[in-house]
Amino acid sequence: MAGPPGDDIFRATLAAVAPGTPFRDGLERILRGHTGALIVLGHDKVVEGLCTGGFELDVEFSATRLRELAKMDGAIVLSSDLQRIVRAAVHLVPDPTVPTEESGTRHRTAERVAKQAEFPVISVSQSMHIIALYVAGRRYVLDGSAAILSRANQALATLERYKLRLDEVAGTLSALEIEDLVTVRDAISVSQRLEMVRRIADEIEGYVVELGTDGRLLSLQLEELMAGVETERELTVRDYLPIGSKAGTPAQVLGELSAMSPTDLLDLTVLARVIGFSGGADILDRQISPRGYRMLAKVPRLPRMVVDRLVDHFGTLQKLLAAGVDDLQAVDGVGETRARAVREGLSRLAESSILERYV
């Protein structure tokens, strides 16, 4: 799920400066040359108004040119797509009233220009040997691939453990659905685990972006672990969202879940109310019935439109399980062949769910 607009800008900038890109190569050359730099990643009338002195270039970008220009005093201004070097050796004069928490002259200027011009700004520190990125109101120090990979691998190991636990609670829920013994606690526990897994995956996606070409294997592992998780999140909410709920549509509920604080996410009662369940302290022990979206999604080659029609017609999973081939054929778009496939698919799922729980 997409984050705030600031997060989109931040990730897009990280991708532009990731290892393997020409721009990152230029930054690494500046670091190895033990020089500093102040680079504005964008050019418009506002940026032009902050520039004094220097000279106009408007030449194609290259890592070597960036390195050579960084040897001179003054800032470098690039085009918004980072394809051209617009100006070099310029003196940036941002509004001194723009707040900044930095102390060094170069870093203070970088933060103020980033806030005033609303373009990302890079500050390469000669003394501290770091690359600082100022974008969307935040400061971020770019680490090397080794440090990022170490954090990413730790997060991936955590994701694997959480995914294993998610599979366990989801399997238990499926068995309880077949037996019609589901409580609010059972359903909410699955939604809780799905949201936890999504958040860890979102963090790893940030590492993948930051790693650039070095994050290919990490991206493949993440994709494998997260296969079907986003669909499961939606189907679980659609299965258990109370009729006439004040919580809103499934999409709105998923948005509310994404916005929950880590503390609230651990509280099943708070989570239940976000999904639309109301009541007192015994809310978690209330028995509920699923509509059947999760189970029908596991039937092979069953179009989503047909799934919606089946759920609208029967209302609950138990009625679906009790329906015969003739009953299923009464639904628009379900012929005899598809009705038999649904009937046999649900029967197999029911048997396997019970076996997994008790054997």
UniProtKB/Swiss-Prot annotation:
It is an enzyme of class 2 (transferase). Residues 7-146 form the DAC domain. One of its GO terms (molecular function) is adenylate cyclase activity. It catalyses: 2 ATP = 3',3'-c-di-AMP + 2 diphosphate. Its cofactor is Mg(2+). Its EC number is 2.7.7.85. GO terms for biological process: DNA repair. Participates in a DNA-damage check-point that is active prior to asymmetric division when DNA is damaged. DisA forms globular foci that rapidly scan along the chromosomes during sporulation, searching for lesions. When a lesion is present, DisA pauses at the lesion site. This triggers a cellular response that culminates in a temporary block in sporulation initiation. Also has diadenylate cyclase activity, catalyzing the condensation of 2 ATP molecules into cyclic di-AMP (c-di-AMP). c-di-AMP acts as a signaling molecule that couples DNA integrity with progression of sporulation. The rise in c-di-AMP level generated by DisA while scanning the chromosome, operates as a positive signal that advances sporulation; upon encountering a lesion, the DisA focus arrests at the damaged site and halts c-di-AMP synthesis. Homooctamer. Belongs to the DisA family. This is DNA integrity scanning protein DisA. It comes from Frankia casuarinae (strain DSM 45818 / CECT 9043 / HFP020203 / CcI3). The gene is disA.
